[in-house]
């Protein structure tokens, strides 16, 4: 009997460690839809759009499917050749506003993204993590670049609709649709007023956007997306905060492939 109880307890722990939800306020039934967000925000300046989005998202106005995080597995070898296995949880899609029936992806500045991440016990991914998320994705779409009015609210919504036309209601971890706003040592070392972007992988697995810190931190365009990562990393089934992982000279390689992995969050 004791063995049965122990087995059941072990399975419950394993099941809990393999699933995660972000805790978000319950969405108000009267909250605006994704379409309505873009109609209201069409004339906004970037900081007005940012503030509007943050207010809606922190109030719980996100599609419920976005709360169910997906595990991404990674591993490295230590100096002795021993495998170190880890996994972490990410949102299945990019930060969005609305209901499951009418929602839309919302490009945001890193300051707004960080505010949302902090509120939901999350952080933004690194370049390596974006690569690993792409490899793990079950829905991989071909990038669709747009060239006119790249930073306009209208173009942001048009791009969302194009992606939805490609997706064709397929569900699961999606990638290949956006450049990620990422954490990078290049920001802390060289360009504190900049943002780092990376990704938008093509079907061959190569990113359109190499790691880039040329944009000022308030620049937001249609191609940017915000992927949230739950801040607890499970290393050999031990729960460790992502900052402690990035500070560890060995474990940081699980999450980061840069020489300096000392940029943990964007100030706001």
Report the location of each language-model feature.
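C-terminal, surface-exposed recognition/capping segments
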Residues: 149-268
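Soluble non-cytosolic domains of exported or imported proteins
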Residues: 44-48, 66, 81, 103-111, ...
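Conserved hydrophobic ligand-interaction patch in extracellular adhesion modules
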Residues: 110-172, 228
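Conserved oxyanion/phosphate-binding beta-strand-loop segments in alpha/beta enzyme cores
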Residues: 61-91
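Bacterial Sec-dependent N-terminal signal peptides
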Residues: 1-22
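Residues that flank catalytic or metal-binding motifs in active/ligand-binding sites
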Residues: 84-86, 120, 222-224
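N-terminal module-boundary/linker segments of secreted carbohydrate-active enzymes
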Residues: 21-68, 213, 243, 250-268
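Second-shell loop/turn segments in exported
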Residues: 97-104, 119-120, 214-215
């Amino acid at each position: 009997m004791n063995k049965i109880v122990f087995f059941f307890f072990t399975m419950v722990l394993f099941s809990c460690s393999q699933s995660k939800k972000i805790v978000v306020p319950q969405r108000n039934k009267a909250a605006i839809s994704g379409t309505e967000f873009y109609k209201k925000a069409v004339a906004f300046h970037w900081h007005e759009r940012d503030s509007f989005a943050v207010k809606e998202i922190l109030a719980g106005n996100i599609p419920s499917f976005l709360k169910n995080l997906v595990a991404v597995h990674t591993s490295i070898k230590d100096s002795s050749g021993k495998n170190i296995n880890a996994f972490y949880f990410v949102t299945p899609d990019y930060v969005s506003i609305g209901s499951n029936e009418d929602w839309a992806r919302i490009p945001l500045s890193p300051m707004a993204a960080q505010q949302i991440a902090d509120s939901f016990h999350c952080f933004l991914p690194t370049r390596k993590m974006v690569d690993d998320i792409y490899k793990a994705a079950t829905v991989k779409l071909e990038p669709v670049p747009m060239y006119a009015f790249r930073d306009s609210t209208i173009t942001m919504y048009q791009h969302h609709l194009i992606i939805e036309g490609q997706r064709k209601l397929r569900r699961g971890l999606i990638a290949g649709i956006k450049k990620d706003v990422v954490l990078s040592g290049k920001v802390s070392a060289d360009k504190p007023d900049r943002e780092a972007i990376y990704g938008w992988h093509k079907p061959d697995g190569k990113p359109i956007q190499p790691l880039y810190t040329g944009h000022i931190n308030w620049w937001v365009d249609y191609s940017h997306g915000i992927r949230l990562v739950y801040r607890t990393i499970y290393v050999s089934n031990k729960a460790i905060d992502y900052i402690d992982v990035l500070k560890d000279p060995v474990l940081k390689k699980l999450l980061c492939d840069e020489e300096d992995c000392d940029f943990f969050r964007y100030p706001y």
